[in-house]
């Protein structure tokens, strides 16, 4: 039985998380520090998001800083504490990834962090795209009991990474491969059809002008790094709905094809159908 496609929104704020829920997103990944690739949000953000998200699952990125994924002992302890806080605040899942200097999955550190997760779902984030051997890394991640991998297929965008994404899906059915980076309503169906994936990660943000009336153009809070002081990026419900619409059409086509195949091959047992339904229920729990 074909799985229903799901969208995870990379929410850069609680406001974005709420808009993602309003648009029908299955899950949000709550992040701070988007220009750095996403860092751990604050206690207050996690708590408020948990209070407001009652229809959409809440995952929290655990990343103490931007940059690489080789973490110092102090950073490792910070990650451990942040995982415990996310769990205590009621997050449905956490998102993290750690590498060695040689570009391999840091299995001992990952196992230490996994021990703190409890019942939360776990996504190995785009540290995967920095692994020196993606297929070996995937086996290590599966061995850790992680639920899914967020990846662009080790390319600049998920669309460019379709060949590797497809290989990873075909390599094994024990873990969810979730394409992310550059995914939008214009390419999500193509990525879905060419890779066989059913979960997708994107931001769907639009820029909103600041409400500030007085603006001092001589000063920037980013110092020498130019950051738009008076624009705010927020999840755009219309972009989320457009992507969901594309996936809904794909899912309907898949169902029609499945029905046609069943009519041509009616020998599948009721027991096999029951097994398929159980698999779908397990996916919904993640």
Residue ranges and their predicted role:
Residues 27-39, 85, 89-101, 146-161, ...:
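Glycine-rich phosphate-binding active-site loops on the catalytic face of alpha/beta enzymes
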Residues 2-13, 62-78, 123-134:
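Active-site mouth loops of central-metabolism enzymes
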Residues 21-28, 53-55, 90-93, 116-119, ...:
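Glycine-enriched alpha-helix->loop->beta-strand junction motifs that scaffold or abut catalytic
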Residues 12-19, 70-82, 132-144, 168, ...:
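Catalytic cores of alpha/beta
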Residues 5-9, 28-30, 58-62, 94-96, ...:
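Hydrophobic faces of well-ordered beta-strands that scaffold small-molecule active sites
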Residues 47-85:
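Structural motif corresponding to the early beta-alpha repeats
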Residues 173-255:
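C-terminal alpha-helical cap/extension of soluble enzyme domains
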């Amino acid at each position: 039985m074909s799985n229903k496609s799901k969208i995870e929104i990379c929410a850069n704020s609680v406001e974005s998380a709420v808009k993602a829920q309003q648009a029908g997103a299955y899950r949000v990944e709550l992040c701070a520090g988007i220009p750095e690739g996403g860092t751990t949000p604050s206690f207050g953000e996690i708590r408020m998001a948990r209070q407001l998200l009652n229809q959409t699952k809440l995952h929290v990125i655990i990343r103490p800083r931007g940059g690489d994924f080789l973490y110092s002992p102090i950073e490792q302890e910070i990650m451990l504490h942040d995982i415990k806080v996310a769990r205590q605040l009621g997050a449905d899942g956490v998102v993290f990834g750690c590498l060695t200097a040689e570009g391999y999955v840091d299995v001992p550190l990952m196992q230490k962090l996994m021990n703190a997760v409890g019942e939360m779902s776990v996504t190995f984030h785009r540290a995967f795209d920095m692994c020196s051997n993606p297929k070996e890394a995937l086996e290590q991640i599966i061995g850790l009991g992680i639920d899914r991998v967020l990846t662009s297929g080790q390319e600049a965008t998920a669309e460019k990474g379709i060949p590797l994404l497809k290989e990873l899906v075909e390599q094994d059915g024990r873990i969810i491969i979730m394409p992310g980076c550059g995914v939008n309503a214009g390419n999500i169906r193509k990525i879905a059809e060419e890779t066989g994936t059913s979960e997708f990660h994107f931001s769907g943000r639009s820029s909103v002008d600041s409400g500030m009336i007085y603006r001092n153009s001589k000063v920037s809070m980013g110092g020498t790094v130019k950051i738009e002081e008076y624009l705010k990026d927020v999840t755009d419900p219309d972009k989320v709905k457009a992507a969901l619409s594309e996936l809904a059409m794909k899912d309907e086509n898949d169902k029609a094809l499945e029905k046609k195949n069943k009519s041509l091959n009616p020998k599948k047992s009721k027991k096999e159908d029951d097994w398929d339904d159980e698999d779908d229920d397990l996916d919904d729990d993640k």
